[in-house]
């Protein structure tokens, strides 16, 4: 009998028998065999392919029976040796993230080979993400600059160097950001001298339309909402301090205010 087999490799052994009695018909059968083997009674072929779960020793008993019911048994053990299997990934990647919100996904793996040590690594990740190779945690918080799609590849490597990779894309959706004012107010003016200051603003959200307005200003000043120009000439009656509040509003209604005082000297 063939008493050795290798995991994932086809095994075959043909039982043959003879009988000294001329004319006896011999019947072949398998009395005991593991489930991964099949036996062809017509040909005597015992065959099958063991899996990782079949690694170890398996008892087999084959029998030949003659016309008068006399039998001969062949009992033996087949030892299935292990072949290293690649690890497998058992977690489903989280492929959506939101700007300014914490993203996390735990990369989980397994290996059918008992005692294999698995090493986790990040092959490709965007800069806003970090990967903990001890726990498999991929985490981070994307900013407005990270809105869009980001390629990620995570890898698991077993003791013998076999690997499995999980490649996916994380799509970061935008959250509207308030605009910011980028200009510094002019806080002094002189009587009878033209005063001017241009409000400028920016928004990190591409495509946002910014609307400029004056919430509070003295009467001697005018504000051009199209250009952001605050201008005017104070008279003697305007000598003193004047409160001003200018505002920028984005497409979604978020605002930024600039409040300051203009001191008019005599």
Sequence positions of predicted segments:
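Proline-centered linker/hinge motifs at extracellular inter-domain junctions
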Residues: 37, 84-88, 129, 176-180, ...
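Extracellular beta-sheet repeat scaffolds used for adhesion and glycan interaction
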Residues: 41, 45-46, 123-128, 132-138, ...
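Conserved structural position at the C-terminal beta-strand
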Residues: 64-66, 156-158, 248-250
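Exposed beta-strand face motif in extracellular beta-rich ectodomains
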Residues: 56-60, 148-152, 240-244
């Amino acid at each position: 009998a063939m008493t050795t087999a290798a995991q994932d490799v086809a095994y075959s052994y043909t039982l043959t028998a003879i009988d000294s009695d001329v004319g006896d018909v011999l019947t072949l059968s398998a009395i005991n065999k593991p489930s991964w083997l099949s036996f062809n009674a017509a040909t005597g072929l015992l065959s099958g392919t063991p899996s990782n779960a079949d690694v170890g020793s398996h008892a087999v008993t084959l029998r030949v029976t003659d016309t008068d019911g006399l039998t001969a048994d062949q009992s033996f053990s087949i030892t299935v040796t292990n072949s290293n299997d690649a690890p497998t990934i058992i977690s489903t990647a989280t492929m959506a993230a939101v700007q300014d919100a914490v993203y996390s996904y735990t990369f989980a793996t397994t290996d059918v080979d008992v005692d294999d040590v698995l090493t986790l690594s990040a092959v490709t990740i965007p800069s806003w993400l970090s990967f903990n190779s001890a726990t498999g945690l991929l985490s981070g918080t994307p900013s407005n600059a990270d809105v869009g799609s980001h390629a990620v590849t995570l890898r698991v490597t077993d003791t013998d160097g076999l690997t499995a990779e999980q490649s996916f894309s994380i799509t970061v959706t935008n959250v509207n950001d308030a605009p910011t004012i980028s200009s510094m107010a002019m806080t002094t003016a002189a009587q009878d001298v033209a005063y001017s200051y241009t409000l400028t603003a920016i928004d990190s959200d591409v495509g946002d339309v910014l609307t400029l307005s004056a919430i509070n200003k003295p009467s001697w000043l005018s504000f051009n909402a199209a250009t952001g120009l605050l201008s005017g000439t104070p008279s003697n009656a305007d000598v003193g301090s004047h409160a001003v509040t200018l505002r920028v509003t984005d497409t979604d209604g978020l605002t930024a205010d600039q409040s300051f005082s203009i001191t008019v000297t005599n």
